[in-house]
């Protein structure tokens, strides 16, 4: 019987006298069709190595293993340690937010891997940020389940209220695609929100050299930190307002431009202009 079976999960929880922990965002996938769709979207092939964060009872883990992937799983809850050890995976009982991802290569995981995970929703943003800040060149693809609201934010287009610094951050590193929506009924227990799967194809080369990443993201964070402000006002602690006005004019934007107006490429152009004239 598959680990996506509700009966199997219920039986396991009864055996260990456990229950899903709300504080760890434990909502377990119990829909085999959704698992197969995640696998198809992820592009995982036999022989790939895959990082899974928060495997829980192991429904997605099992699907990845059956596909022939070599799975590295980071699970915080020791309740699942013994059952996950029954699968042929490299398991770490650890807090993924604190786990040094550079250790993966040190432990022998050579070449680019993939990330496939049903992310704990309360730490989705920190985990996505960590993946690309710590080891951006480690990944071929990142395929993750998250809250639908967050999925729409990170796949938003310029001009909308959902578009923000996280959108730009992820699009800097990857081509980001909203794959499909997942209803609450596909989980146990049912979450109070809809979910979605997002697929990211990581770029071979990034728009800026590594030494400039933090400076660029400081600009975009400042821009969206007070999104009701004009862009020049939002950046006043980083650059003189007149310098921002001049750069915007060179890009054919008005002085009244707001942060959500600029695309990733336009923010990169703005950054180059501001850096060269600062």
From Swiss-Prot:
Swiss-Prot/TrEMBL catalytic activity: adenosine(1518)/adenosine(1519) in 16S rRNA + 4 S-adenosyl-L-methionine = N(6)-dimethyladenosine(1518)/N(6)-dimethyladenosine(1519) in 16S rRNA + 4 S-adenosyl-L-homocysteine + 4 H(+)
EC number, UniProt record: 2.1.1.182
Xref: InterPro entries: KsgA/Erm, rRNA_Ade_diMease-like_C, rRNA_Ade_Mease_Trfase_CS, rRNA_Ade_methylase_Trfase_N, rRNA_adenine_dimethylase, SAM-dependent_MTases_sf
GO molecular function: 16S rRNA (adenine(1518)-N(6)/adenine(1519)-N(6))-dimethyltransferase activity; RNA binding
Gene Ontology, cellular component aspect: cytosol
Keyword field: Cytoplasm, Methyltransferase, RNA-binding, rRNA processing, S-adenosyl-L-methionine, Transferase
Superkingdom as given in the UniProt entry: Bacteria
Pfam families cross-referenced by the UniProt entry: RrnaAD
Broad class of the protein's primary localization: cytoplasm
Role this protein plays: Specifically dimethylates two adjacent adenosines (A1518 and A1519) in the loop of a conserved hairpin near the 3'-end of 16S rRNA in the 30S particle. May play a critical role in biogenesis of 30S subunits.
Family: Belongs to the class I-like SAM-binding methyltransferase superfamily. rRNA adenine N(6)-methyltransferase family. RsmA subfamily.
NCBIfam families: ksgA
Name of the featured protein: Ribosomal RNA small subunit methyltransferase A
Native species: Chlamydia caviae (strain ATCC VR-813 / DSM 19441 / 03DC25 / GPIC) (Chlamydophila caviae)
Native organism taxonomy: Bacteria, Pseudomonadati, Chlamydiota, Chlamydiia, Chlamydiales
